[in-house]
Swiss-Prot record:
Molecular function in Gene Ontology: aminoacyl-tRNA deacylase activity; ATP binding; catalytic activity, acting on a protein; proline-tRNA ligase activity; transferase activity
Subunit structure: Homodimer.
GO biological process: prolyl-tRNA aminoacylation
InterPro entries tied to this protein: aa-tRNA-synt_IIb, aa-tRNA-synth_II, aa-tRNA-synth_II/BPL/LPL, Anticodon-bd, Anticodon-bd_dom_sf, Pro-tRNA-ligase_IIa, Pro-tRNA-synth_IIa_bac-type, Pro-tRNA-Synthase_IIa_type1
Protein name: Proline--tRNA ligase
Pfam families per the UniProt record, alphabetical: HGTP_anticodon (PF03129), tRNA-synt_2b (PF00587), tRNA_edit (PF04073)
Family label: Belongs to the class-II aminoacyl-tRNA synthetase family. ProS type 1 subfamily.
Compartment list: Cytoplasm
Function, in words: Catalyzes the attachment of proline to tRNA(Pro) in a two-step reaction: proline is first activated by ATP to form Pro-AMP and then transferred to the acceptor end of tRNA(Pro). As ProRS can inadvertently accommodate and process non-cognate amino acids such as alanine and cysteine, to avoid such errors it has two additional distinct editing activities against alanine. One activity is designated as 'pretransfer' editing and involves the tRNA(Pro)-independent hydrolysis of activated Ala-AMP.
EC number: 6.1.1.15
PANTHER family recorded: MITOCHONDRIAL RIBOSOME PROTEIN L39/PROLYL-TRNA LIGASE FAMILY MEMBER, PROLINE--TRNA LIGASE
Keywords, comma-separated and alphabetical: Aminoacyl-tRNA synthetase, ATP-binding, Cytoplasm, Ligase, Nucleotide-binding, Protein biosynthesis
This protein's record includes keyword Ligase: yes
Amino acid sequence: MKMSNMLVGTLREVPAEAEIESHKLMLRAGLMRKMAAGIYNYMPLGLKVIENVKNIVREEMNNAGAQEFLASALIPAELWQESGRWDAYGAEMFRLKDRHNRDFCLGPTHEEVFTDIVRNEIKSYKQLPLNLYQIQTKYRDERRPRFGVMRSREFIMKDGYSFDKDQEGLDLAYEKMRKAYVNIFNRCGLDAKAVAADSGAIGGSGSAEFMVKSEVGEDDVVFCTACDYAANIEKAPSTPEHAEKEELMEVEKVETPAVKSIEDLAKFFECSPKKIAKTLIFQADDKVVAVVLRGDREANEVKIANAIGEVIELEMASEEAVKEATGAAVGFAGPMGIKVDILLVDQEVANMYNFIIGANETDMHLKNVNYGRDFEGIVGDFRNVTIGEKCPECGKEITISRGTEVGHIFKLGTKYSESMGATFIDEDGKAKPFIMGCYGIGVTRTVASIIEQHNDENGIIWPLEVAPYHVSVIPANVKNEEQATKAEEIYNELRKMGVEALLDDRKERAGVKFKDSELMGIPMRITVGKMIGEGQVEFKLRNGGEVETLSIEEVYNRVRKEFERENLSL
């Protein structure tokens, strides 16, 4: 491609809306342009990268025995109602009606569609196993779109589904997909790790996320310092810290005027936050739920939602709801006598002695409270783990890092096949539900994650296999006929070799062209300058290294060498 013919617009200034490096660079390098909040148009350069990632995904999925097809993005409500998710998915689903007043949605995910296709097409165990996938645009009405394509309302995703006759078949399909995902992310140049995860709204049992470590990641990921254990913090079990046993004392009401925060309470009572139990009140659809945690702990909303069961939306209760539940101002809630539908008590609180709680009375707290004697609830693990707690597998210490999810694999089991009546006839002539697996990759999020891991102060540094162009050929002075002619000859020869080459034939200064080539992340640069009269050009790698002066024939071999180094063929 010649840049004089390209729709490309690089930006020198960082757009005010962009918060993270990938968002900044995707806009500055001309990969995409914003149309509305969380909605982007992909420019030619960005689309080439997306297509390269798609091709990697296709190759690895096909190699693992999966078949590609394309489902409709517009889905009738009936399918979602069959699975019970039409109401369960919540406000993130884009819903619409056709001219006949029939309900539809723009697909945020496609379990129901795939299940419907397979129940109509597959009748016998002889037609199994089956693994289908598609690469398609998905739609989710995010409450707060941010970070560019990391959390957008429209995004490209590969979603695949396996159908087996038994658990053994599912386990095999799941492992094939896990290996395929490892290959995909390695080829994309990503340092990604599979971690244990919660199944969320998708449902099912076994689940793993492929996480990319990132300082701006939206997820906290728990890693063991000694073994291979890794899990999303939503999933990681906490290790309760047992308090020293004490003789139970009588409950005492204490006036605490305007003392609401844990920090202020600890100062007021001259105690550690570990001696305080805080009561958080949530609205879980139509239920009011109170959760009691040790004062220094953070609530884990996924664990809480799982304990409640079938929750569409979980959020902190309004001030009005808190007052109705406690009869007091916000900041004085406690588990004794609270009026809620469900009371959850973290296992750590159940093992504390003589602790402090809100009295459900404005400006009042209770001390010397003990679980079992003074109140009871559903005891469980409802908090986030913290650095230094014990690994659930080896007992050594854990650490926590930020991460971005780029892929997710699930063992769905029969969740959808049973609810939608999707069955096959087994060897004994009996109807049985398909055993399903689900496998997703965020294609556009993967592109952004590659940029997050591969950039410097000058711009993007694309890994060779995903780069929009492999080589940028730059005539230093397009007005110099010899430079312009030789640059085009080199460009044409590279294309004959199978190299994606970009000829910067714009009437711009060489410095502008160099900056744009670096900003766009082109892995190799060949400059045709004053030394062309001696048959020599300059070669430079985007990811570092010195400028090399080579003959024209040598530069072709140098390009080949980079492909060989990356195990790529021409």
